[in-house]
Amino acid sequence: MKKIFIMSIITMLSSLYSCQAQNKGYKSLSADDYEKAIADTAVIRLDVRTAEEFANGHIRCAINIDVLKSNFEQKAAATLPKSKTIAVNCRSGKRSKNAAAILTKNGYQVIELDSGFIGWQAAGKEIIKE
């Protein structure tokens, strides 16, 4: 009886997690898939790391709006057209998921680099340094 109860709980939690992952409203992509997606020049590349991180290396043609700043939503609204897909990246993927959720909530079509800039570098993708 105890086993059945535990299995029921595990199944229920798995279902809830699966529903949450499907309803996030944006797509998380591997470095290869992200590279293919941003090859479309209509896609806007958004790096949500700090200005210092951005200056040390970023994806070509990316613009920088720090998601940790209190004015992120205002800057995004003033800078990013809702008619375009926004491709978001950060260092490891955590901040980009946060930014993607904020942007999606505000009506943007969003994709994000699941492994972040670290994964981009590890995959040997092009990096621009300023």
Which residues fall in each region the model found?
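Short, surface-exposed ligand- or partner-binding patches at beta-edge/loop junctions that are enriched
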Residues: 89
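Structural scaffold elements adjacent to functional motifs in cytosolic proteins
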Residues: 45-47
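Rhodanese-like catalytic fold shared by cysteine-dependent sulfurtransferases
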Residues: 2-5, 17-43, 52-85, 94-130
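Hydrophobic helical h-region of N-terminal Sec-dependent signal peptides
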Residues: 6-14
